[in-house]
Amino acid sequence: TTELLPVGTEAPDFQITNDKTGEKIFRLSDWKTKTDADGKVVPGVWTVLDFWASWCPDCRKDMPKVKEISKKYLTKIQLVGISFDTDKEKMNKYLSSNHYDQWMQYCEGKKWKETQISKDYHISWIPTSYLIDPEGKVYFSTVKAEEMMQKLDSLNNLGKLTAFIEMPHYPGGKAVLMKQLSVNTKFPKLCQKYKAAAKVKVEFIVEKDGNVSDVGIQSYQVLDNPNGKDFNKLSGAEQTQVRSQIRTLFEQEGIRVVNTLGKWIPGKIRGEATRVHYTVPIVFRLY
């Protein structure tokens, strides 16, 4: 790592934009310590930059640890993947199929050595990761995700990593949320008839004003397959059709019940209300 940017170097700035709209999604320099219009100091945020590519075997080997970093320090650091993939579609497919799409990605769509960011950050090997401090300077660099985790753990133990994200929460807390879900959820009759059970993860956005939008299904897990005399009488094709109907009904009910919850207390980033992605698990089981 001797060729990498030295500790204390101002981290070269870069920006992630929406490919379709050109809208800014992220700019590194926006996350430095700053003073707002009222003269109040807004603390900066620690940022991990992970340089990688989906075609790189060592990068793929390190990805589970990068995901662990993302999960463990979700509210305390920004994690940005910087990919040297030339095919963004392939990159996105790799990320989504392996559930590595929970953090931001920067990709110029050019060959590694032709990218500006590889020159700015002196990247001669991947994977490589940098830790940028709240003042926007290089604090640490490594070619091993495990070492980055150890550095973050050390900083966290010293109390230097503090939450900059406040997650949305339901008025009255989790117990009230669970009660609302339990009271308002209706068990579909077809699912009851065939004694089916499932766990549905419903995802949605809690908007800045606390309203819920973009409600959809993140995952569906069968807990009990349909069974009983009525189900066993069906042909193979009919059983397949029933399973599909059961899934549709459970998913529709999950979406419906989340839409009945009303307003949430919105999440905040650095003290300002913001849109936050959220998931709620709903278990459908009668017995």
Residue ranges and their predicted role:
Residues 1-13, 17:
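N-terminal targeting signals for export/organelle localization
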Residues 50-71:
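Conserved redox-active cysteine motifs that mediate thiol-disulfide chemistry
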Residues 153-287:
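Charge-biased low-complexity segments
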